[in-house]
């Protein structure tokens, strides 16, 4: 009987509590009250989620390295126009971040907010400098894109096909690099001769190598045979060879 009384009392309390929290659907909430109903943390976390997805789209190689193959055939353009576009996007992202009420965020999201703000401010500051004029680099330069392919995980024939498509698109970045460097030289931007000499040497070594020793072909030559039916790997190698020779 005691249990019944407690259970009954609890049920009555819940009924009154629920009734007190209900809002008449016919009542027209003001804009301010509507905004208060929406949890600031939910909106902020949605913002971060959208930022992450956009970042993967903007950095397809990074996405592939994480195992996300949604953008496995894409590359990031290194044209000056793309740098300008990215700078404007960063500024817009910061404006959207500043719209959140920091005080309404929980402790975890306050930390996320600070980190995101630092990241955006650093990226915007870096975008003020024309780094595209100084893209010659002994590591990670236009001549060593094959190293990116070496870091990827190949789990199927399609992964190799995707990399071949990426290589075909990368020809545009090679042309962009040439244009950017020439524009930079006209404006007085250039890397130290120590760097440029080493880069030229690296490029010469690739251009003067036998095709079977070309680092861009290595990925296809060493492809896992189990991913291919009869004749498919040979066809892939032939197409890769034609692409490399044409560039």
Roles of regions detected by a PLM:
Residues 17-20:
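C-terminal motif of bacterial Sec signal peptides marking the signal peptidase cleavage site
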Residues 22-247:
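N-terminal maturation segment of proteins
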């Amino acid at each position: 009987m005691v249990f019944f009384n407690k259970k009954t009392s609890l049920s009555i309390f819940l009924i009154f509590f629920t009734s007190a929290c209900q809002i008449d659907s016919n009542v027209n909430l003001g804009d301010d009250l509507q905004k208060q109903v929406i949890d600031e943390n939910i909106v902020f976390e949605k913002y971060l989620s959208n930022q992450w997805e956009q970042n993967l789209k903007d950095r397809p190689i990074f996405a592939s390295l994480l195992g996300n193959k949604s953008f496995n055939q894409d590359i990031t353009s290194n044209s000056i126009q793309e740098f300008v576009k990215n700078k404007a996007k960063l500024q817009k992202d910061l404006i959207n971040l500043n719209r959140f009420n920091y005080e309404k965020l929980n402790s975890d999201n306050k930390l996320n907010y600070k980190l995101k703000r630092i990241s955006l401010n650093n990226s915007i500051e870096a975008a003020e400098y024309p780094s595209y004029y100084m893209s010659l680099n002994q590591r990670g330069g236009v001549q060593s894109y094959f190293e990116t392919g070496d870091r990827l995980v190949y789990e199927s024939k399609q992964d190799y096909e995707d990399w071949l498509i990426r290589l075909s698109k990368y020809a545009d970045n090679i042309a962009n690099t040439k244009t950017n460097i020439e524009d930079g030289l006209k404006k007085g931007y250039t890397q130290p001769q120590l760097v440029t000499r080493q880069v030229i040497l690296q490029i010469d070594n690739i251009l003067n190598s036998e095709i079977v020793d070309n680092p861009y072909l290595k990925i296809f030559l060493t492809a896992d045979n189990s991913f291919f039916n009869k004749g498919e790997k040979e066809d892939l190698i032939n197409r890769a060879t034609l692409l490399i020779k044409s560039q």
